Amino acid sequence: MITGAIKSGRVDKVWVIPSGYPPKKEAAALTPAPYRYYMTEAALKSIEGCEVLPIEMLRPEKSYTTDTLSYIREEGVAGPDDKLILIYGTDILFELETWYHPERIVRQAELLLARRPGVLQESTLRKATELEEKYGIEISYFPIEGVNISSREIRRTGDYSKLAAPVRQFIARHDLYPKENPLVFLKDETHALLFEYETKLFRELSRERLLHSLNTAVLSVRYAVRFGISPDEAAVAGLLHDCAKQLPIALQASMAKKVMGEPLPDNSLLHAPAGQIYAAERYGIDNESILSAIRYHTTGRENMTTLEKIVYLADKLEPARDYTDLTAIRALAEKDLDEAVIACLKAVRDKFEQKRTAFHADSSRALDSLIRRSKTKIESITETTQQTEEKMDTLALSNEIIEILKNKKAEDVELIPISDKTALADYFIIATGTSTTHIKALSDEVELLMKQNRNLTPDHIEGQSTSRWILIDYKDIVVHIFHPEERAHYSLDKLWMTKRPEDTNIVELPES
């Protein structure tokens, strides 16, 4: 279409403006805007007379064509004597009237439509005449060669052979269209927030740094869904983990000092504590779990939260990372989060030792605490195996927790065996509270009675600040107490009751 428009002689140049946040499409079905922008650049960079403009990437609001045309005029992108022409296929004739203020659009720009070989269908000509009479305009056409290609079909089949080589390479490098898209688990408001953040990051980060941040966000969401924490928090933490990375070093240092005082770490690590401050001040993040995950994404720390582990791993394992063979750690991350973080920390330690560089103290403490936790879990399993007559098994404990929840009026309580799907735990218990107050009361009751009756203390508890989804981790048993809206959205029961399709990219590790 672009080359046809240029050859037609009707235009001097072609501007291609990838949509930012199109109002007529579901956010969950959209590939994140920076991916689409950079992929378009890769596809069109060799076409003379064509330029890709980031106009809709710079505006955080929904992208309406009339507003984009106004921006082009008001910001001087086009000169006062330039004529603006909108180039589309003829299918636009049947959609134009549903757009936001079509009467403005046709006053702001002429319509030049691509016509495939052959005679225009009668219905198309009739619609064109109807629009010309309704709006007092003249619609023009230019010929193009027929191309039998559909973006929807390409995504469905995964056959990218008809795409330009730079686009195929881009898709492969960033794993853009996996069979399972983790972003469908995000709330609509999270998608809107992510686009707002992306427009700011687009101005402040390099192309490669922004793509890395997006990759980290997507992988963080995948791990969050896999290991049972909020994918919305994981998406934000993953996207913003490097938000301060390309600020001036002096500014990074001053921000880091607010968090950790003196002495400051090496310059290469400043962006993590600085990012905690910058994410709060620039992006309005007030969720302490997210801010902590940003702060510790480079080093880890002792007793890391699940979100911190996920962002730490996603930063190191996102698909564009190719500085070493990550196959084994990536495979491990699909099954056992702690063991994957241990393997990653050990790999970093070994690399530093080879360079004769000091292993960061926080990383050392993180590794030690995870190894202790792993040993404790192994010892606990061994002891349980050896003393089954003295200890109640996890199924019996799960049933006891279920009884506590039901006695406290929890709704839709379910027990899900997951030991055959992951090393994370043996069972998930999922329950619903009627309100945030009820959810907090259910959590407190489980914690209190399991301590009194079985001398069991949770390894950690997450979500008490909002009480819309509280996670109580008893190592082999993980209790999820949801607000009804959160449970309906995340559907953990359906996710874990259904076996995950085999991922051909995953290499199985030996049982040892």
Annotated model-derived regions:
Residues G49-E56, K62-A78, D82-T90, L247, ...:
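Helix-adjacent hinge/juxtasegments
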Residues Y160-E189, D350-I381, E508-S512:
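Charged phosphate-binding loop/patch that engages nucleotide di/tri-phosphates or the phosphate backbone
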Residues I381-A423, T436-I470, P484-E485, L495-S512:
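Polybasic/polar functional segments that serve as interface/processing modules
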Residues T199-E204, H212, V221-L345:
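Divalent metal-dependent catalytic cores for phosphoryl transfer on phosphate-bearing substrates
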Residues M1-E189:
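Nucleotidyltransferase catalytic core that binds NTPs
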Residues P23-K24, A29-L30, L58-R59, P417-T432, ...:
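Short, charge-patterned binding micro-sites
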Residues I472-Y474:
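Active-site beta-strand termini and strand-to-loop segments that position acidic
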